[in-house]
Amino acid sequence: MGKEKTHINIVVIGHVDSGKSTTTGHLIYKCGGIDKRTIEKFEKEAQEMGKGSFKYAWVLDKLKAERERGITIDIALWKFETAKFYVTIIDAPGHRDFIKNMITGTSQADCAVLVVACGTGEFEAGISKNGQTREHALLAQTLGVKQMIVACNKMDSTEPPFSEKRFEEIITEVKSFIKKIGYNPATIPFVPISGFNGDNMLEPSANMSWYKGWSVERKEGNASGKTLLEALDCIIPPQRPTDRPLRLPLQDVYKIGGIGTVPVGRVETGVIKPGMVVTFAPQNVTTEVKSVEMHHESLPEAQPGDNVGFNVKNVSVKDIRRGSVCSDSKNDPAKESKSFTAQVIVMNHPGQIGAGYTPVLDCHTAHIACKFAELKEKVDRRTGKKVEDPPKFLKSGDAGIVELIPTKPLCVEAFTDYAPLGRFAVRDMRQTVAVGVIKGVTKDDGSGGKVTKSAAKKK
């Protein structure tokens, strides 16, 4: 057995008809976890329904439909392999929870693949004021997806087909707008493809002999190649934040007979191990960790990404709950957030947001109403320039800096300190109306909390 490949997550973004499904379907189909039987079944159905031309998208639509209906389909279907990586597609933007998932960090993408359609008129529609191309790219940037690949799709439908002039025209335009939102075009591969016919997907295309390949320059090393698959292989794998102080947002707290209180959650940063003295915020309860378990096996130490249960001494189920954050009491312990400033993007709010608006925020596992206490400034979402300060209102499409005050105790962190605890979705009227990234937090000084005996002994 060789060394297991590194796992990376990608998110595929772009305008509604850019061909995301076909492109993604093609990768999964050719390099992925779908077995031949399933593919043949899908193909036969597609043929019978006269959808033969949608072969790859059809594969994806079937998966999506099953996922939408809540059938837990084999998750391997959303994975494929490159020479270096196991790649998981964490979400397709057509999926209604896409934005919420990106923010609440069920999924942090390592790289965004931006698909743009190159057909006559298609690119222009996607990148227009109302198109989703810019919005998705801005969202990826705001949520801290640092790497990007641009797939210039539908090269087979340019005039004339596979036109070099059209490709150049499009990448000039895309470079200009992604630069405005904060990406450096020199670090981004631009690949002309046909997701449907397979040009430059896995093998270099004979139809675009003019294309000399993509190349990127970055501090981790330069890279070049010809295909989309090679571009995916050049993603810089994420550094797991093991060396940061512990942050573990609780998903649940169980009371288990004969054992006691067992909080459960995913380690986001740092490590947790038996014997450690931990503090739960915002409750400010300090205690000792007796044992740490994953998949019913006890662990000497759990690391970022691990979903664990751990047993704590002398803490009742009433003391802590879902949304509490577990931290190392000796290393930058988590504290209650009295207020915080955030950059927000208003997505689909029917009216306008003004001071006093109090919707529910989903941040890590917490779900708590927070008041927009003050709108500090408005930012043009296309240029990132300040427009008017302080604005009276923010409406759909606006971005701004706001001050938020939780209505109940809450623990969040600045995005730059602890990214998974620094992104949030604003929920109202059963939908995501805005997303945000936390710039700074005013914390409670944390005096006068409950400390159990065993924790006090260890101090």
From Swiss-Prot:
Region: G1, residue numbers: 14-21
Location of the region described as G2 in the Swiss-Prot/TrEMBL record: 70-74
Region (G4): 153-156
Ranges for region G5: 194-196
Alphabetical list of PROSITE patterns matching this protein: G_TR_1, G_TR_2
Entry annotated with the keyword Acyltransferase: no
UniProt entry keywords in alphabetical sequence: Cytoplasm, Elongation factor, GTP-binding, Nucleotide-binding, Phosphoprotein, Protein biosynthesis
Chain positions covered by the region annotation G3: 91-94
Family: Belongs to the TRAFAC class translation factor GTPase superfamily. Classic translation factor GTPase family. EF-Tu/EF-1A subfamily.
Name the UniProt record assigns to this protein: Elongation factor 1-alpha 2
Upper classification of the organism: Eukaryota, Metazoa, Ecdysozoa, Nematoda, Chromadorea
Gene: eft-2
